[in-house]
């Protein structure tokens, strides 16, 4: 209601963001998605989920929805390094992410992918290579996140016991790394997010104290300073 008053005529995408939003019986999912689409001024859906939490039946249904309205399925890929995925107990492999993305693309559904930079055991080179590999898949949207240590999680306990296992990036280091990623990925992928922000009361580290819009402004400036642009060094096959 607040945004409806502030932005007259604004249309919206209903974002099923938290948790795995395809992990339920099809009829329950159908009810939730249709309920969202019945809301005034909602013109589409963004559905976040895991690569191992989608079935063919669910994808077939979403494909039908995508012929009626805008739909994007976002997969939490997080890393292309299977050893890192095992370390953080993701419960899926990169091959499973590839398969889910391809099955989704075959149905004509728009696809987004999420990557986390700074997971335990992942090197800078591995993260950069992983971003390129993910963008070589038939995705349209990429969202990037820095690793954040959040209170009350298993990773927070591990961090407090063994901080040496973690390589948390400073703001400047992360900024320059994102510039490197932008230069190497497919030029037609939409970058919709560069950083994430956990509430201050839950965040253990890193504490940058910067807003998303501030990061974007500094990123644009750093790209100009370094003479970089998206896809400048891209040599991949793309959308295979």
State what each model feature region is.
Residues 83-94, 159-168:
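Glycine-rich tight-turn/loop motif centered on a GG-T
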Residues 6-92, 99-100, 106:
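Conserved SAM/AdoMet-binding glycine-rich loop
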Residues 63-65, 92, 130-132, 160-163, ...:
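Short, hinge-like loop/turn segments at secondary-structure boundaries
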Residues 36-42, 129-144, 216-230:
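Structural recognition of alpha->loop->beta junctions
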Residues 18-22, 51-53, 77-81, 115-121, ...:
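Active-site-proximal loop/turn and secondary-structure-junction residues that shape catalytic pockets
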Residues 95-155, 172-195:
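Conserved C-terminal portion of the radical SAM core fold
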Residues 141, 149-240:
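Auxiliary Fe-S-binding modules of radical SAM enzymes
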Residues 1-3:
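Active-site-flanking structural segment that lines cofactor/substrate pockets
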């Amino acid at each position: 209601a607040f945004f409806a008053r502030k932005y007259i005529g604004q249309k919206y995408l209903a974002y099923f963001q938290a948790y795995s939003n395809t992990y339920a019986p099809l009829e329950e999912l159908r009810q939730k998605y249709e309920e969202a689409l019945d809301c005034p001024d909602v013109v589409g859906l963004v559905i976040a989920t895991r690569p191992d939490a989608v079935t063919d039946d669910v994808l077939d249904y979403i494909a039908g929805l995508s012929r009626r309205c805008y739909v994007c399925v976002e997969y939490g890929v997080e890393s292309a390094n299977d050893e890192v995925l095992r370390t953080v107990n993701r419960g899926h492999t990169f091959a499973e992410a590839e398969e889910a993305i391809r099955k989704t693309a075959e149905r004509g559904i728009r696809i987004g992918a999420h990557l986390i930079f700074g997971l335990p055991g992942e090197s800078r080179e591995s993260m950069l290579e992983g971003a390129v590999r993910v963008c070589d898949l038939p995705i349209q949207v990429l969202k990037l996140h820095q690793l954040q240590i959040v209170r009350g999680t298993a990773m927070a306990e591990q961090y407090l016991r063994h901080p040496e296992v973690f390589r948390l990036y400073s703001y400047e280091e992360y900024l320059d790394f994102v510039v490197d990623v932008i230069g190497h990925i497919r030029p037609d992928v939409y970058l919709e997010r560069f950083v994430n922000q956990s509430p201050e009361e839950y965040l253990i580290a890193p504490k940058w104290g910067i807003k998303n819009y501030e990061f974007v402004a500094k990123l644009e400036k750093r790209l100009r300073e370094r003479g970089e642009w998206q896809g400048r060094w891209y040599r991949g096959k793309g959308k295979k």
